[in-house]
Amino acid sequence: MDLLMRSDKLKNVHSDIRGPVFVEATRMRKEGIDVLRLNTGNPATFGFEMPDSVRNALINNADKAVPYCDLKGMPEARESICSYHKGKGFKDITPEDVFIGNGVSELVTMALTTLLNYGDEILVPSPDYSLWTNSVYIAGAKPVHYICDEQANWYPDLDDIKSKITPKTRAIVLINPNNPTGALYPRELLEKLVQIARENNLVIFSDEIYDRLVMDELEHVSTATLAPDLLVITMNGLSKSHIICGFRCGWMVLSGAKEAAKDFAAGLVQLCAMRLCANALPQLVIPAALADPESTRAMIVPGGRLYEQREATCRELDKIEGITYVKNSAAFYIFPKLDIKKFNITDDQQFAMDYLHSKHVMIIPGRGFSWNEPDHFRIVMLPKPEVLAKAMRDLGDFLSDYWQQV
């Protein structure tokens, strides 16, 4: 038989989080080399534990997950999600506006597949979380990347966004809090972004999965609360805030111009029906998890692990000549900048590979986040503070005489 080749729809799809550097690190680990994995946001692998509220809800209700559930998700779970978002200021939403999925990843792909036609364009941030760019490609559309400005706390560049809107632009993606930068967008900025969407009749996708991991007593503002006249699709879930990445527990909420989006919503129902239902077991913990904000808050205040891990990382980064960064306000990521002239860096993947081979620490190069210059990389700040501090000291030692060989 002829060779079977992958679809052209996958031509531009990439996942550097589990890309070449990950593959090489996996090979090294199989050979018995201890590799510190700062590549993926998977808290449980670094000693974080799910809250007792989640564990007890799972154990006490497991039998309820045996049959298929509603194709949009269990009613009790959708009711608790609806109440959570109403508490954040959402107006005129009901449990029928909530769709539960096998993680936000599944829902992003479903929503973009439902919305986009071949040739459509959608505005996606650069840097971004690659799921968004990849899902646009899989839907047959074109991601158009707008710049988030490092000199302005990694906030979206409004002029750049305006310059990239065309008659083919259907929607804009906002990742707030942001992955990979850890930026948190203030209300005033969100109002301006919403106004751009309003003036250009754009759907807004607002990825807010890190909204419960905001530090320094800052406020997270949900985009939907500022756009009651627009269709806003808000993505959220429990993977990070409640340490259950493997459960694949995410949801999306449709708000605003729902009347105009009836056919779109019907399309989402079609795709939900195709997979019968999302995994029922993790849905059982949603009400208990959302009723237990303190278990998350304990991690993000002074003395909490996420807070102290950030502080340890930044203290050591401050000591490295040739690296600058913007301190994250949320989540557990930071996206430092390298002085590429100082280190002769032309290939960020090669830099990450060299660091891996030298110090046995795995990071993800900026290219994995739709960043076109070879001058950034993402650090996942999940190991304990002393481990992160050593990794950053190792980075400084590595860079002290680094000169990339071309």
Predicted regions and their residues:
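N-terminal small-domain helix-loop-helix segment of the aminotransferase-like
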Residues: 2-103, 110, 289-292, 401-406
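Generic structural signal for small/hydrophobic residues in well-ordered secondary structure
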Residues: 21, 38, 58, 81, ...
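Conserved core segment of the aminotransferase class I/II
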Residues: 55, 228-304, 314-316, 399
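PLP-dependent enzyme catalytic core of the Aspartate aminotransferase-like
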Residues: 87, 162-163, 344-346, 354-363, ...
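Conserved PLP-anchoring active-site segment centered on the Schiff-base-forming lysine
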Residues: 114-136
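Active-site phosphate-binding strand-loop segment of PLP-dependent enzymes
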Residues: 144, 149-220
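Conserved glycine-rich beta-strand-loop-beta hairpin in the small C-terminal domain of fold type I
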Residues: 287, 303-314, 325-339, 373
